[in-house]
A protein has these predicted regions:
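Short, charged/polar connector segments at secondary-structure boundaries
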Residues: 1-131
């Protein structure tokens, strides 16, 4: 598996993407700006996005010219279609250990950071803390 840089103008969003991701793009852009582009966009052999539509929108908000991509050339068309859905759905199955999360956020709160975890979607009501 090789990570390649692809010009964002060459990437094609999947026309039937069932995910509504406009609300997440700004938070993902803030994450990319703060931590770097750590999760490549998955594309097929025709540069159509398999997974990573939100990351593409975030890259556009940041005016990036290119993004890291992985070509899923080891998957059949059927597997790509299934992976496109599975990749989004499986993350919804995870839950937060609220005690551990509060501890992590509390430790971050004690550090001198140039950002706030609310930049990445955390709500004070979700965690009961100062973020």
């Amino acid at each position: 598996m090789e990570i390649i840089e692809v010009n964002i103008k060459d990437l094609k969003p999947y026309e039937n993407n069932p995910r509504n991701n406009d609300d997440a793009a700004a938070a993902v852009a803030r994450s990319i700006k703060e931590f770097g582009f750590k999760v490549p966009i998955i594309i097929d052999e025709h540069n159509t996005i398999v997974a990573g539509h939100t990351r593409l929108k975030a890259a556009m908000l940041l005016n990036l010219e290119s993004v890291p991509c992985i070509v899923a050339d080891d998957l059949s068309e059927e597997q790509i279609k299934a992976f496109r859905l599975a990749d989004n759905k499986v993350s919804e199955l995870a839950t937060w250990d609220m005690e551990a999360l509060e501890k992590e956020l509390s430790e971050l709160d004690d550090m001198d950071l140039d950002f706030n975890m609310s930049d990445f979607g955390f709500e004070p009501s979700e965690i009961g803390g100062g973020y």
